[in-house]
Amino acid sequence: MSKHSHFRDKKMFQKKAEQFKKFQERISVQFQNEKLLYQAFTHSSYVNEHRKKPYEDNERLEFLGDAVLELTISQFLYAKYPAMSEGDLTKLRAAIVCEPSLVSLAHELSFGELVLLGKGEEMTGGRKRPALLADVFEAFIGALYLDQGLEAVVTFLKAYVFPKIDDGAFSHVMDFKSQLQEFVQRDGRGILEYKILQEKGPAHNREFEANVSLKGEVLGVGSGRSKKEAEQHAAQEALAKLQKHHMKQ
């Protein structure tokens, strides 16, 4: 099937082709088989309204993309957090690939503008529907995998997803104090000590600063709206420092 045959008419083809061209330039990805790219953004409602045309919706690509996304995220987390338990790795991965996270990524990359929808779905606001956008993101990952392989998917995720993990966007599901404790105990390094360094701000907007030390050496410092949050951030910094040192050995 040609690229042109995926659209209703020549005018629509030219408009969409230009949109997809700019999209690929923006994300620094060039599909070898653009039919896969178009399919990733084709909703079943569009196919149902054009049964006489050989259109394919994105549902099979979504199925594949879901598995590819879980694999690549799992590989990244396994390498990045050597002290994290299987249970915590699973929770973190779930937070990264859950619908709200994928919708946020889809919005960030303007996926909604490219989706091909049936008239009925369009009229009922389907273009902004969270589940639809999450599905399109997974379908895009599946299409990229088929077009260029796992390495291309990892390169894309390095640009748009992995930095968010590094920046702590999903830290709300992570218990850094427990991870740090496990890391230290595993190597028999000693006992961790947490200390609240200061409290500042009015009672309704208090901020705490804490550090964590091992055998007198400060490993991390953190701040937060509660003592617990400050200690978690201190543990996060300490864990990152110890893991970086561990990986260099």
UniProtKB/Swiss-Prot annotation:
Its cofactor is Mg(2+). It is found in: Cytoplasm. CDD domains: DSRM_RNAse_III_family, RIBOc. GO terms for molecular function: double-stranded RNA binding; metal ion binding; ribonuclease III activity; rRNA binding. Residues 175-244 form the DRBM domain. The keyword Hydrolase applies. GO terms for biological process: mRNA processing; regulation of gene expression; rRNA processing; tRNA processing. Keywords: Cytoplasm, Endonuclease, Hydrolase, Magnesium, Metal-binding, mRNA processing, Nuclease, RNA-binding, rRNA processing, rRNA-binding, tRNA processing. The active site is at D66, E138. Belongs to the ribonuclease III family. Digests double-stranded RNA. Involved in the processing of primary rRNA transcript to yield the immediate precursors to the large and small rRNAs (23S and 16S). Processes some mRNAs, and tRNAs when they are encoded in the rRNA operon. Processes pre-crRNA and tracrRNA of type II CRISPR loci if present in the organism. NCBIfam families: RNaseIII (TIGR02191). Homodimer. This is Ribonuclease 3. The gene is rnc.
